[in-house]
């Protein structure tokens, strides 16, 4: 059983005797053969072959015994099992270093003969460096004999035949699959053609159907568009009234917000000042707290020292008390001794008569005893004085300790009170900070509301500007209509006087074809021209001024946003400004005002947007006066409660 470990083309350097070096590539194959008959052993087979030369064959069989001798000869450090992998690593390093200019590892094939024919060769793995060429491994390979070459060629032929068989089989499989795929492709192409024809007919029917549905949907969409336009006009009127109300509310809200903003800013400044004061107080209280803590630490240290001194004094007092107890015991013993001596003295006095001989001796002894008693009494007095002094010192120390304890207790109480005050101040400062934050949030919210209201105000102002531009355009259109009418009336100046008077009274010539609705291309909406009579009733001073200054010119639309109260002019003669003709107009056949057909109420009329707040308020104040003053000479009309946007006397469409 053989296991191929390595089989690749390896570049090497070929050196023959008396020949130049040449580079070439040789296929190196390494196999591990394991034999079990008669003894289990493993052999390493190294074979060199050349793909271009089939007779180039060198073999080397290394058994475990051969490897041991090789290991001893060349000083190898690996065992037989690890040797193949190390040899493969060296070959791979030679392959990697081959492309470099100065390769570090080289594979050399050395021959002692002039040609590589039947002579053994040496395969060396050389490591090059600037100092020396080191040979890591040198293997002696023997050329193959005829039998080995024939076996090798037979094996190569067998491998090539097997490869050919496998390739022919794969070719047959591929051709079979190709035929199958071609057949399926033709079937799929036929199905695709059928599907295309079906799809074309289906798409044609669908396009016809969808075109019919699309026309029906277009008609429905046109109907819905008309309905939506009508709804839009109604919503537009409602939105204009709502817009005016919103402007009133926003202006009042703006004034309230400004007042609230002022109050909040004042409160903020007051809060800032209180916060500064509280911070200053807090800093002072913290300094006092630090001082008190330092005093407490110093007092605690003194207390510790006094405690140690007190313990030492107590120890000293205990020692003195023990000494006093010893002395008292001695005094008691001596008192007993004195009592005994007294008893002996009594017995001696009693026995004095009998013992007169020993009287002198007893008197001497008695004198000695009295001297000892005196000395003992003096010592007792001294000991009593020492005890009294120690008791006095102990009382003074205890008094000092009591004083220091009382002082420390008072200091701790003061510290606790100051800490409570500090906590209260901190709570107050936190509450003030939270109040300030809430106020700041409220101020930000109010500022945002103020910005939105200001933005809405600016939008309404922009709308007013657009409406003023529209008014100027209306004036221009009216002037152009008046000029056209003037040119037409110049051609018909020969008509009877009665017809001119009737046309003057009615406001415009009946022959003039005045368009009911003026189309404004800039707005995209057709606006109706309101009645001149209602305009004169609403703004009598404007019409009178225009008639006196420009008697020839036609009716113009003017707006005075700051209107005076027209009660006097309206109550006086409501129809005077309408029916008063000018002398120059009589001569030229011109009329001042519009025809009676334009004074009728239009159901489809749309009021203009964006009237200013002052004009609306004035129109509301003048509503009752205008209703009383607006009367036609032939047919009285009933006015509704609401007025038009640009002509306060015109009726809006309901």
Swiss-Prot record:
PTM info: Ubiquitinated by the SCF(FBXW5) E3 ubiquitin-protein ligase complex during S phase, leading to its degradation and preventing centriole reduplication. Ubiquitinated by the anaphase promoting complex/cyclosome (APC/C) E3 ubiquitin-protein ligase complex, leading to its degradation and preventing centriole reduplication.
Gene3D superfamilies the UniProt entry points to: Spindle assembly abnormal protein 6, N-terminal domain
GO CC terms of this entry: centriole; centrosome; cytoplasm; deuterosome; procentriole replication complex
Domain called PISA: residue spans: 39-91
Phenotype on disruption: Mutant embryos arrest at E9.5; likely due to impaired centriole formation that activates the TP53BP1/USP28/TP53 mitotic surveillance pathway, leading to cell death.
Subcellular location: Cytoplasm, Cytoskeleton, Microtubule organizing center, Centrosome; Cytoplasm, Cytoskeleton, Microtubule organizing center, Centrosome, Centriole
Keyword presence, Coiled coil: yes
The protein, known as: Spindle assembly abnormal protein 6 homolog
Species per Swiss-Prot/TrEMBL record: Mus musculus
Lineage, broadest ranks: Eukaryota, Metazoa, Chordata, Craniata, Vertebrata
